[in-house]
């Protein structure tokens, strides 16, 4: 990786999130609004680290002895992209050298957020589990998502709803859906 592609703060933390590797748990809850971070972390047994840089607020602590990090992404897919790239860098890049680590790590990411449609039968602050997501800005085309791309539903939307702009539909992985559908979080 070119050093210009990964900007660090003077303290060695990643630029936007102001996090270092040791500040990050392997389980990360992502929320949009920075005020939602406190709504979640007020239930933590212990807080070990807090930081904020503009809309990016991060808190790491423990809940029932499980270490968790909560990060706010701000608004929009481009902000989420920044957050995910910096989180990935924290676990898969040597921040001193900029070299990709030989052993790659995956984070457990859980997105908790609001949807664009509120229905009378769904109370505010309810938890919903989505089986599909629709990308309206084409941002996800930057990634290889062929394993979850739902081309038939995308075609249906385009043909039956006279949508001019291209939409892309992605399925939640069945493994992830089944895990959350059968577990009380």
Model-assigned labels for residue ranges:
Residues 1-175, 179-182:
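Metabolite-binding pocket within alpha/beta catalytic cores that recognizes anionic/polar moieties
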Residues 185:
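Short catalytic/ligand-gating loop segments at beta-alpha or beta-beta junctions
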């Amino acid at each position: 990786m070119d050093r210009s592609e990964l900007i660090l703060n003077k303290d060695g933390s990643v630029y936007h999130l102001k996090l270092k590797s040791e500040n990050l748990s392997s389980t990360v809850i992502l929320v949009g609004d920075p005020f939602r971070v406190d709504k979640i972390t007020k239930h933590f047994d212990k807080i070990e680290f807090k930081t904020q840089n503009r809309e990016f607020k991060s808190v790491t602590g423990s809940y029932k002895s499980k270490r968790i990090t909560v990060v706010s992404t701000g608004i929009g897919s481009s902000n989420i992209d920044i957050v995910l790239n910096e989180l990935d860098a924290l676990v898969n890049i040597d921040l001193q050298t900029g070299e990709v680590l030989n052993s790659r790590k995956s984070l457990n990411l859980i997105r908790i957020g609001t949807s664009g449609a509120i229905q009378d039968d769904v109370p505010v602050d309810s938890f919903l589990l989505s089986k599909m997501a629709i990308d309206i800005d084409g941002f996800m085309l930057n990634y290889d998502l062929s394993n979850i791309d739902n081309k038939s539903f995308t075609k249906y939307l385009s043909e039956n709803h006279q949508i001019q702009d291209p939409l892309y539909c992605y399925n939640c992985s069945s493994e992830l859906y089944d895990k959350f559908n059968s577990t009380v979080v």
